[in-house]
Amino acid sequence: MLKVGIFGATGRVGKLLIEEILNHTHFNLSSVYVRNELQYSLPSSTMVTKDFEIFLQASDVIIDFSSPEATKALLEVALSYPKPLVIGTTGLDNDIQHLLENASHTMPILYATNMSKGVAMLNKIGALVAATLKESDIEICEIHHRYKKDAPSGTALTLAQSCAKARNLKLSDVRISGRNGNIGERNSNEIGVMSLRGGDVAGRHTIGFYLDGEYLELTHNATSRLTFAKGALDMAKWIVTQKNGLYSIEDALEI
């Protein structure tokens, strides 16, 4: 039985992870890190703690769906107490990305802005289309619930990065997030990344490839956040078998 620690237990996905683990015979909810008192009860066998060292040492693998600041703190402590990590926190800045890369030299880390297998396939296929339909204009649109804090979503940026890489472009040079006023003609290399917020949408991502006379749109819809929790647990089972290094969900799916 795999002992799983949850970091970010009070978040939407964190709560779903806990529910899924408690209903799963192959996992043991071994530790939960909390800064404030939980509003729900957990089994007496689960270590609930504010101490990073105790939290890390109680588990075989850690799943993190928290905030960029919390993820940074986790990584800094994990350097002294290495554990396989599955990180799904979005909105990481360059400094945290570098910390993530450095930490992967001492432990296996799987980082993904989206734990959905369907999104992993969208990312792969999108890059293929971007490379093949070189003359197409690429526009990415993402929709999420009203409570999502970061925009564009980490998933949208990942999709945009893959499309840019497929065309040998640097995303920071070609990304456009929003258009307003008399902006002139569209640059052929632009990759538009647009964000909508409303309701309880779990996640919708569309990559559009627009040509003269036709267009192709690839869309992934998440109908429940449970797909992210299930995906993260699948990744946890995989990452504990890997050597030190930084991995993606595409590595786990071998695509």
UniProtKB/Swiss-Prot annotation:
GO cellular component, one term: cytosol
GO MF term list: 4-hydroxy-tetrahydrodipicolinate reductase; NAD binding; NADP binding; oxidoreductase activity, acting on CH or CH2 groups, NAD or NADP as acceptor
Compartment annotation: Cytoplasm
Record keyword Oxidoreductase present: yes
Binding-site residues, NAD(+): G8, A9, T10, G11, R12, V13, G88, T89, T90, A112, T113, N114, M115
Catalytic reactions of this protein: (S)-2,3,4,5-tetrahydrodipicolinate + NAD(+) + H2O = (2S,4S)-4-hydroxy-2,3,4,5-tetrahydrodipicolinate + NADH + H(+); (S)-2,3,4,5-tetrahydrodipicolinate + NADP(+) + H2O = (2S,4S)-4-hydroxy-2,3,4,5-tetrahydrodipicolinate + NADPH + H(+)
Key words, A-Z: Amino-acid biosynthesis, Cytoplasm, Diaminopimelate biosynthesis, Lysine biosynthesis, NAD, NADP, Oxidoreductase
Active site feature: H144, K148
Metabolic or biological pathway: Amino-acid biosynthesis; L-lysine biosynthesis via DAP pathway; (S)-tetrahydrodipicolinate from L-aspartate: step 4/4
Keyword set includes Endoplasmic reticulum: no
PROSITE patterns: DAPB
Residues given in the record as (S)-2,3,4,5-tetrahydrodipicolinate binding sites: H145, G154, T155
This enzyme's EC code(s): 1.17.1.8
Role noted for this protein: Catalyzes the conversion of 4-hydroxy-tetrahydrodipicolinate (HTPA) to tetrahydrodipicolinate.
Family in the record: Belongs to the DapB family.
HAMAP family found in the cross-reference section: DapB
NCBIfam families hit by this protein: dapB
Protein name: 4-hydroxy-tetrahydrodipicolinate reductase
Species the sequence originates in: Helicobacter hepaticus (strain ATCC 51449 / 3B1)
Taxonomic classification: Bacteria, Pseudomonadati, Campylobacterota, Epsilonproteobacteria, Campylobacterales
Gene that produces this protein: dapB
